[in-house]
Amino acid sequence: MPPVTLADDLAYAVSFPTPPRRVVSLVPSITEALATTCPERLVGATDWCTHPSDLVVQRVRGTKNPDLAAIRALEPDLVVANKEENRELDVGRLRADGIPVWVTDIETVPGALDSLERLFTEVLQLGTPGWLESARAEWGGPVPEPSIDVAVAIWRDPWMAVGRDTFTGDVVARLGWRNVLAGSSERYPHVELADLDRDGVVVLLPDEPYVFGPDDGPEAFTRARTALVSGRLLTWYGPSLVGARAALSAAVTG
């Protein structure tokens, strides 16, 4: 097979002499997707790559501080990164060592599924995974008119929330909910508690990145209703999208 050159999500040309067989993933969502689809090709992942729970690969530290020496030692023919989750500096250093790095850029559910399909079919030269087809069926169709106002908290002390142009925001919209902070000038703005604690708003409290729980989060709100939700279902793209619609809807609307 002749070498293939493809443009990643940031339009960077990445050359592959052969379909990659030794893959390091720096993105938890994509690690789960790879481990579910082609586990024999996945040789390294970050400490934050928690799914599947029985994943056994070399760990290469965190998403923001990967152990570049450990990655090099694995002799990967592909490293998968993400514009938001990983540092451009680390991507550049790996590329300078001659390692192909494929960078994804995810802001919507359809965009995530398209990006993952390209990764599996064009880069890895595999077929479309069954879970991806199921996710398309579950999340396809037009965005419904919103019926519930929500805010998505991601941190406290200081409070932060989901703002504009995010994957999570698109998930929320496709569930038929209106993110009351979607008009923010920032993607993840710092906010005052009063910006979230409003009459008629449901505040979603996920368990990542901040670990909200029954005794840490709901007690701060006196006006808004709160709902503890799975951060993975709300923020990860990949196999976790299958079944996420029903689970998130049940957590919020009962």
Regions found by a protein language model. Give the residues of each.
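N-terminal ligand-binding lobe of clamshell/alpha-beta domains
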Residues: M1-G254
